[in-house]
Amino acid sequence: MSRICQITGKKPLSGNKRSHSMNAKKRKFFPNLHNHRFWLDKEKKFINLRISKQGLRLIDKYGIKKVMEKIKIKYKNV
């Protein structure tokens, strides 16, 4: 569970590593995850999230407030 983005839900993918002679060897493709701290004005506190670069771009585009509201709605339905 530690290699999952908390915003987008991206997980490691499996595939093949190919050598020059096209021999296949199993490998994993990991998302570009980073630990990042965000300030929430509404709650007056910091939160720590483990997010992918795509998740960070979503936060830059829409703002942490909208993204957090969408996440809470997503987790309430499950």
From Swiss-Prot:
It comes from the Bacteria. InterPro entries: Ribosomal_bL28, Ribosomal_bL28/bL31-like_sf, Ribosomal_bL28_bact-type, Ribosomal_bL28_sf. SUPFAM superfamilies: L28p-like. Residues 1-23 are annotated as: Disordered. Keywords: Ribonucleoprotein, Ribosomal protein. One of its GO terms (cellular component) is cytosolic large ribosomal subunit. One of its GO terms (molecular function) is structural constituent of ribosome. GO terms for biological process: translation. Belongs to the bacterial ribosomal protein bL28 family. HAMAP family: Ribosomal_bL28. This is Large ribosomal subunit protein bL28. The lineage of its organism: Bacteria, Pseudomonadati, Pseudomonadota, Gammaproteobacteria, Enterobacterales.
